[in-house]
Amino acid sequence: MNINLTLFGQTIAFAIFVWFCMKFVWPPLTQAMQERQKKIAEGLDAAGRAERDLQLAQERAAQMLRETKEQAAEILDRANKTANAIVEEAKAQARSEGEKLIAGAKAEIDLEVNRAKDQLRAQVAALAVTGAEQILQSTVDGAAHNDLVAKLASQL
Protein backbone atom coordinates (compact mmCIF):
# COMPACT_ATOMS: atom_id res chain seq x y z
CA MET A 1 0.00 0.00 0.00
CA ASN A 2 1.02 3.36 -0.79
CA ILE A 3 1.38 5.93 2.00
CA ASN A 4 -0.07 8.65 -0.15
CA LEU A 5 -3.19 6.69 -0.89
CA THR A 6 -3.58 5.78 2.80
CA LEU A 7 -3.03 9.36 3.81
CA PHE A 8 -5.54 10.51 1.23
CA GLY A 9 -8.11 7.92 2.47
CA GLN A 10 -7.61 8.91 6.08
CA THR A 11 -8.02 12.57 5.15
CA ILE A 12 -11.30 11.82 3.39
CA ALA A 13 -12.49 9.70 6.35
CA PHE A 14 -11.52 12.48 8.73
CA ALA A 15 -13.33 15.07 6.60
CA ILE A 16 -16.46 12.87 6.58
CA PHE A 17 -16.14 12.45 10.35
CA VAL A 18 -15.79 16.24 10.81
CA TRP A 19 -18.75 16.88 8.51
CA PHE A 20 -20.84 14.27 10.38
CA CYS A 21 -19.89 15.79 13.75
CA MET A 22 -20.60 19.34 12.52
CA LYS A 23 -23.93 18.28 11.03
CA PHE A 24 -25.33 15.92 13.68
CA VAL A 25 -23.30 16.05 16.91
CA TRP A 26 -22.18 19.68 17.25
CA PRO A 27 -25.62 21.47 17.01
CA PRO A 28 -27.20 19.52 19.91
CA LEU A 29 -24.04 20.06 21.99
CA THR A 30 -23.99 23.81 21.33
CA GLN A 31 -27.71 24.00 21.94
CA ALA A 32 -27.32 22.14 25.26
CA MET A 33 -24.45 24.44 26.25
CA GLN A 34 -26.49 27.53 25.33
CA GLU A 35 -29.49 26.27 27.30
CA ARG A 36 -27.26 25.50 30.26
CA GLN A 37 -25.63 28.95 29.97
CA LYS A 38 -29.08 30.53 29.79
CA LYS A 39 -30.24 28.60 32.90
CA ILE A 40 -27.12 29.65 34.78
CA ALA A 41 -27.65 33.30 33.80
CA GLU A 42 -31.31 33.09 34.86
CA GLY A 43 -30.27 31.48 38.15
CA LEU A 44 -27.73 34.25 38.77
CA ASP A 45 -30.34 36.90 37.94
CA ALA A 46 -32.84 35.22 40.26
CA ALA A 47 -30.21 35.07 43.01
CA GLY A 48 -29.45 38.77 42.48
CA ARG A 49 -33.14 39.63 42.61
CA ALA A 50 -33.61 37.48 45.70
CA GLU A 51 -30.66 39.19 47.36
CA ARG A 52 -32.09 42.63 46.53
CA ASP A 53 -35.52 41.53 47.75
CA LEU A 54 -33.96 40.24 50.97
CA GLN A 55 -32.10 43.50 51.46
CA LEU A 56 -35.29 45.50 50.82
CA ALA A 57 -37.23 43.28 53.22
CA GLN A 58 -34.55 43.76 55.89
CA GLU A 59 -34.65 47.53 55.36
CA ARG A 60 -38.45 47.51 55.59
CA ALA A 61 -38.29 45.40 58.75
CA ALA A 62 -35.73 47.77 60.27
CA GLN A 63 -37.88 50.77 59.31
CA MET A 64 -40.99 49.14 60.80
CA LEU A 65 -39.03 48.34 63.96
CA ARG A 66 -37.90 51.98 64.24
CA GLU A 67 -41.45 53.22 63.67
CA THR A 68 -42.79 50.77 66.24
CA LYS A 69 -40.19 51.90 68.77
CA GLU A 70 -41.08 55.54 68.09
CA GLN A 71 -44.78 54.78 68.49
CA ALA A 72 -44.10 52.92 71.72
CA ALA A 73 -42.05 55.87 72.99
CA GLU A 74 -44.87 58.26 72.04
CA ILE A 75 -47.44 56.05 73.78
CA LEU A 76 -45.28 55.88 76.91
CA ASP A 77 -44.76 59.63 76.82
CA ARG A 78 -48.49 60.24 76.48
CA ALA A 79 -49.21 57.76 79.28
CA ASN A 80 -46.67 59.47 81.53
CA LYS A 81 -48.14 62.88 80.74
CA THR A 82 -51.64 61.58 81.42
CA ALA A 83 -50.51 59.99 84.68
CA ASN A 84 -48.78 63.21 85.73
CA ALA A 85 -51.88 65.21 84.83
CA ILE A 86 -54.06 62.84 86.86
CA VAL A 87 -51.66 63.08 89.82
CA GLU A 88 -51.57 66.88 89.58
CA GLU A 89 -55.37 66.99 89.33
CA ALA A 90 -55.66 64.73 92.38
CA LYS A 91 -53.19 66.94 94.27
CA ALA A 92 -55.14 70.06 93.33
CA GLN A 93 -58.40 68.40 94.33
CA ALA A 94 -56.87 67.26 97.63
CA ARG A 95 -55.56 70.79 98.27
CA SER A 96 -58.98 72.22 97.49
CA GLU A 97 -60.72 69.75 99.77
CA GLY A 98 -58.10 70.38 102.46
CA GLU A 99 -58.64 74.11 102.18
CA LYS A 100 -62.40 73.57 102.41
CA LEU A 101 -61.94 71.41 105.50
CA ILE A 102 -59.62 74.00 107.04
CA ALA A 103 -62.07 76.79 106.25
CA GLY A 104 -64.91 74.72 107.75
CA ALA A 105 -62.84 73.99 110.85
CA LYS A 106 -61.92 77.68 111.19
CA ALA A 107 -65.57 78.65 110.85
CA GLU A 108 -66.50 76.08 113.47
CA ILE A 109 -63.73 77.35 115.77
CA ASP A 110 -64.91 80.94 115.27
CA LEU A 111 -68.45 79.84 116.03
CA GLU A 112 -67.33 78.07 119.21
CA VAL A 113 -65.24 81.12 120.23
CA ASN A 114 -68.25 83.38 119.70
CA ARG A 115 -70.43 81.01 121.73
CA ALA A 116 -67.84 80.95 124.50
CA LYS A 117 -67.61 84.76 124.42
CA ASP A 118 -71.38 85.02 124.58
CA GLN A 119 -71.46 82.61 127.51
CA LEU A 120 -68.66 84.54 129.22
CA ARG A 121 -70.51 87.82 128.67
CA ALA A 122 -73.63 86.32 130.14
CA GLN A 123 -71.65 84.99 133.09
CA VAL A 124 -69.84 88.33 133.56
CA ALA A 125 -73.15 90.16 133.42
CA ALA A 126 -74.64 87.75 135.95
CA LEU A 127 -71.58 88.13 138.16
CA ALA A 128 -71.73 91.91 137.85
CA VAL A 129 -75.39 91.89 138.79
CA THR A 130 -74.69 89.54 141.66
CA GLY A 131 -71.77 91.68 142.76
CA ALA A 132 -73.84 94.85 142.53
CA GLU A 133 -76.61 93.21 144.55
CA GLN A 134 -74.16 92.16 147.23
CA ILE A 135 -72.59 95.61 147.30
CA LEU A 136 -75.97 97.28 147.56
CA GLN A 137 -77.26 94.92 150.21
CA SER A 138 -74.29 95.24 152.45
CA THR A 139 -73.25 98.37 154.22
CA VAL A 140 -70.91 100.80 152.66
CA ASP A 141 -67.54 99.57 153.83
CA GLY A 142 -64.34 100.08 151.74
CA ALA A 143 -62.65 96.92 152.93
CA ALA A 144 -65.75 94.86 152.21
CA HIS A 145 -66.04 96.44 148.75
CA ASN A 146 -62.43 95.59 148.01
CA ASP A 147 -62.99 92.00 149.15
CA LEU A 148 -66.08 91.72 146.92
CA VAL A 149 -64.22 93.12 143.89
CA ALA A 150 -61.35 90.68 144.53
CA LYS A 151 -63.85 87.80 144.69
CA LEU A 152 -65.43 89.01 141.44
CA ALA A 153 -62.03 89.23 139.75
CA SER A 154 -61.13 85.71 140.87
CA GLN A 155 -64.41 84.39 139.48
CA LEU A 156 -63.76 85.91 136.06
UniProtKB/Swiss-Prot annotation:
InterPro entries tied to this protein: ATP_synth_B-like_membr_sf (IPR028987), ATP_synth_b/b'su_bac/chlpt (IPR002146), ATP_synth_F0_bsu_bac (IPR005864), ATP_synthase_B_chain (IPR050059)
Protein name: ATP synthase subunit b
CDD domains linked to this entry: ATP-synt_Fo_b
Family: Belongs to the ATPase B chain family.
Membrane-related topology note: Single-pass membrane protein
Its job: F(1)F(0) ATP synthase produces ATP from ADP in the presence of a proton or sodium gradient. F-type ATPases consist of two structural domains, F(1) containing the extramembraneous catalytic core and F(0) containing the membrane proton channel, linked together by a central stalk and a peripheral stalk. During catalysis, ATP synthesis in the catalytic domain of F(1) is coupled via a rotary mechanism of the central stalk subunits to proton translocation.
Localization per record: Cell inner membrane
Keyword annotations: ATP synthesis, Cell inner membrane, Cell membrane, CF(0), Hydrogen ion transport, Ion transport, Membrane, Transmembrane, Transmembrane helix, Transport
Spans through the membrane: 7-29
Chief location bin: membrane
Subunit (UniProt): F-type ATPases have 2 components, F(1) - the catalytic core - and F(0) - the membrane proton channel. F(1) has five subunits: alpha(3), beta(3), gamma(1), delta(1), epsilon(1). F(0) has three main subunits: a(1), b(2) and c(10-14). The alpha and beta chains form an alternating ring which encloses part of the gamma chain. F(1) is attached to F(0) by a central stalk formed by the gamma and epsilon chains, while a peripheral stalk is formed by the delta and b chains.
GO terms assigned for molecular function: proton-transporting ATP synthase activity, rotational mechanism; proton-transporting ATPase activity, rotational mechanism
Record NCBIfam families: ATP_synt_b (TIGR01144), PRK05759.1-2 (NF004411)
Assigned GO CC terms: plasma membrane; proton-transporting ATP synthase complex
